[in-house]
Curated annotation (Swiss-Prot):
Class of enzymatic activity (EC top level): lyase
Name of this chain's protein: 3-keto-L-gulonate-6-phosphate decarboxylase SgbH
Oligomer status and interactors: Homodimer.
Reactions listed under catalytic activity: 3-dehydro-L-gulonate 6-phosphate + H(+) = L-xylulose 5-phosphate + CO2
Keywords, alphabetical: Carbohydrate metabolism, Decarboxylase, Lyase, Magnesium, Metal-binding
Residues involved in substrate binding: 11, 192
Length: 220
């Protein structure tokens, strides 16, 4: 398995605050995510601004698209995103059209695994060409005390076996990473664990050290 990447999630309410954290962390992460809350507040300009600030990083438009996959993908990739998220509840036609536009633009679609979905759904996404999904505990699940469990790991392994690479998020810390050693991990996504830390670059370094220890290979 390839070495997982480290993704900074920017779920800020203002672009100014998000860009301050990017300034602190852009040299310590591989991927910068324009989070859903940020994009709802700041619009398409958030993606454009992050692309300008981080010309050499992977930029994610975390829009959780449910319809109009082709149109929104064209806007996301046109603004400078490399990846765009589509919610798992979206019709397969939406995923297919979004994926087709991503292919034309040199980007990728990530399926956001929120709520109800099945492994048959995952096989359908893989069949039409999607190769990425995001597995996570949402904010509400974390607040209720939900922990990563065997059921989560079994589902992740099943998704990996289908051929999907997973970005994993939901209160992730460096100490959690050994749980996922048998999973096909594309990236670990951290928001508050990085941006909210007293020493963000040090925490990012701890993530990379754990990734190196488990998966091997130095960061490019």
């Amino acid at each position: 398995m390839s070495r997982p990447l480290l993704q900074l999630a920017l779920d800020h309410s203002s672009l100014e605050a998000a860009q301050r954290d990017v300034t602190l962390l852009k040299d310590s992460v591989d991927i910068v995510e324009a989070g859903t809350i940020l994009c709802l507040n700041e619009g398409l300009g958030a993606v454009k601004a992050l692309r300008e600030q981080c010309p050499d990083k992977i930029i994610v438009a975390d829009w959780k698209v449910a319809d109009a996959g082709e149109t929104l993908a064209q806007q996301a990739f046109g603004a400078g995103a490399n990846w765009m998220t589509i919610i798992c509840a979206a019709p397969l036609a939406t995923v297919e059209k979004g994926h087709a536009m991503a292919q034309r633009c040199g980007g990728e679609i990530q399926i956001e695994l929120f709520g109800n979905w099945t492994l048959d759904d995952a096989r359908d996404w893989h069949r039409i060409g999607v190769r990425q999904a995001i597995y996570h505990r949402g904010r509400d699940a974390q607040a209720s005390g939900q922990q990563w469990g065997e059921a989560d790991l079994a589902r992740m392994k099943a998704l990996s076996d289908i051929g999907l690479e997973l970005s994993i998020t939901g209160g992730i810390t460096p100490a959690d990473l050994p749980l996922f050693k048998d999973i096909r991990v594309k990236a670990f996504i951290a928001g508050r664990a990085l941006a909210g830390a007293a020493n963000p670059a040090q925490v990012a370094g701890d993530f990379h050290a754990q990734i190196d220890a488990i998966w091997g290979g130095a960061r490019a």
